Amino acid sequence: MATAGKVIKCKAAVAWEAGKPLSIEEVEVAPPQAMEVRVKILFTSLCHTDVYFWEAKGQTPVFPRIFGHEAGGIIESVGEGVTDVAPGDHVLPVFTGECKECAHCKSAESNMCDLLRINTDRGVMIADGKSRFSINGKPIYHFVGTSTFSEYTVMHVGCVAKINPQAPLDKVCVLSCGYSTGLGASINVAKPPKGSTVAVFGLGAVGLAAAEGARIAGASRIIGVDLNPSRFEEARKFGCTEFVNPKDHNKPVQEVLAEMTNGGVDRSVECTGNINAMIQAFECVHDGWGVAVLVGVPHKDAEFKTHPMNFLNERTLKGTFFGNYKPRTDLPNVVELYMKKELEVEKFITHSVPFAEINKAFDLMAKGEGIRCIIRMEN
């Protein structure tokens, strides 16, 4: 493209300080360096992780910063050494990468790339420790290697998944984070047998995707656990068959679930990150064969406490990161599931706003309205 090798001036939503509305600014985006790509973002969406680090309550504040990591776009230009993708390719940016060289990438059992694993505190590119964004010569920091709240962004090539160009980017962009995290937690990690019973703790975006994954895997009972009863009706669309609100009971929720299921659920997936919910999700699975999968990210000082007999009685506890998907290897296949109509991504998308109104997406999330809000970069 004519812009290759040159600085691009474009619009970006800049967070100047914690918790303050984003400001649409003209930024300069430098060309990609070795093993980097510059991507034209067409659609992006707001994920709770963006809000969490934008609020920066207890996290390292890195500002000014361009947030955003759930998106779809087209490669504008590539840096030296990039052979996997070319200008014009359709891609999904991913907050965690796959270098394809490290021990994790070479292992069939891991997706925790040594080089490109998520780092929320780093606001610069790993190649040279510098930002590719600037305003009047002053750096604007990156977020989790993606920074998709910008018309153009620069990423390491290991953080983009090349996908089918026929796939609608305004739909499949949500597959680059939350949807795949929940879906994979069920399909790849919990692996519920056909006809089994699954409990899903937390019916936000990731929990609904986990319920969808359990439904696709063939679970016959999917019990949604949430403190907000207004989420129950929505969750039926994602396969939930029953609901438990812990507030409605005067006994621990793991006991309620055990009574409902003749001794415990076959699988549970915990999507809140609340340490008590994590413990409940483990203790509610059936002895002998029950498997609990932890997805939600806990408070940094949280401690998981349970009696060792819960393990000795043959319950299994697993953790997962990004649904155990390797971004570059596996995400194109998840997109193909959508193209074959095996995934109903549309149910996930409840709102859409133009880029100029990006702060509306933050307002919707603050009010707990909807699931995903698509931000349209061009109109």
Curated annotation (Swiss-Prot):
Zn(2+) 2 binds at C99, C102, C105, C113. InterPro entries: ADH-like_C, ADH-like_N, ADH_Zn_CS, GroES-like_sf, NAD(P)-bd_dom_sf. It catalyses: a primary alcohol + NAD(+) = an aldehyde + NADH + H(+); a secondary alcohol + NAD(+) = a ketone + NADH + H(+). GO terms for cellular component: cytosol. NAD(+) binds at residues 49, 202-207, 226, 231, 272, 295-297, 322, 372. It is an enzyme of class 1 (oxidoreductase). Binds 2 Zn(2+) ions per subunit. Zn(2+) 1 binds at C47, T49, H69, C177. Its cofactor is Zn(2+). Pfam families: ADH_N, ADH_zinc_N. Its main location: cytoplasm. The keyword Cytoplasm applies. Its EC number is 1.1.1.1. Keywords: Cytoplasm, Metal-binding, NAD, Oxidoreductase, Zinc. Homodimer. Belongs to the zinc-containing alcohol dehydrogenase family. PANTHER family: ALCOHOL DEHYDROGENASE, ALCOHOL DEHYDROGENASE 1. In maize there are two isozymes. This is Alcohol dehydrogenase 1. The lineage of its organism: Eukaryota, Viridiplantae, Streptophyta, Embryophyta, Tracheophyta.
